[in-house]
Amino acid sequence: MRKQVLALSDTAAARIRQLLQHQQKPFLRLAVEAKGCNGLSYVLNYAQEKGKFDEVVEEKGVKILVDPKAVMHVIGTEMDFVDDKLRSEFVFVNPNATKCGCGESFTTT
């Protein structure tokens, strides 16, 4: 059985729902791009439609499209949302990732 590509915390799902309603978009798209000293960084964008090979993650009332090039790097990842005095951001807990010293990028094993 294949691992779930992406899991959402309740706070992440609530924030995504709020953002999608505000932007009047049906999807949030997750991709990875080459960046930082370790090679990869998470990228989130709004999407109006599903790409031909996108993986659809539907959980807790929201739909996230995972770019096909990102799937192998994010399998088993939990997406959370942190909002405190110092930051307000999505956080990715990826069991396959090794982070770099700068904290801006990761690599998968």
From Swiss-Prot:
* Organelle transit peptide: 1-18
Establish whether keyword Iron is in the entry.
yes
Q: Where in the cell is it found?
A: Mitochondrion
- Report the InterPro entries cross-referenced here: Fe-S_cluster_asmbl/transfer, FeS_biogenesis, FeS_cluster_insertion, HesB-like_dom_sf
Its principal location? mitochondrion
Q: Indicate the quaternary assembly.
A: Homodimer; may form tetramers and higher multimers.
Q: Which GO terms describe its cellular component?
A: mitochondrion
Q: Name one Pfam family in it.
A: Fe-S_biosyn
Family (UniProt): Belongs to the HesB/IscA family.
Q: How is the cofactor bound?
A: Binds 2 iron ions per dimer. The dimer may bind additional iron ions.
Question: By what name is this protein known?
Answer: Iron-sulfur assembly protein IscA-like 3, mitochondrial
GO terms of molecular function:
iron-sulfur cluster binding; metal ion binding
Q: Which biological process terms from the Gene Ontology are attached to this UniProt entry? A: iron-sulfur cluster assembly
Keyword annotations for this protein, in alphabetical order, are: Iron, Iron-sulfur, Metal-binding, Mitochondrion, Transit peptide
